[in-house]
């Protein structure tokens, strides 16, 4: 596994590459075959940390693995544009956080800045559009946006 971080051949850059490579290995070890990235292997998954992890592997040059993370978001998105707050956990969870839903915009922009892939933006734009609509649906008459919705 090699990283496109630094082309310098000095001890400091080699040291940094090894640190980043360990970060990447850990994140990739937490990624399921369906693209979901859990907190730890065989642990919970929340959309916010999932997107954070996708951005981490973006920076480290793992484009296909990152795209797989967005595929997970796409396939697990609810019809109202949201995601549940937690996945792969024993307790039933019906909470849908508005900040989790809109955070896909940050992740997609980050991915684009790293890889300049407009096809990626076009592909996942419908998910982003739905997610933003869900977030805006939480806006109150005072202009603020409720933190979360519970489907119950």
Label the model's feature ranges.
Residues 38, 84, 121, 146-148:
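Generic, ordered loop/turn and secondary-structure boundary motif
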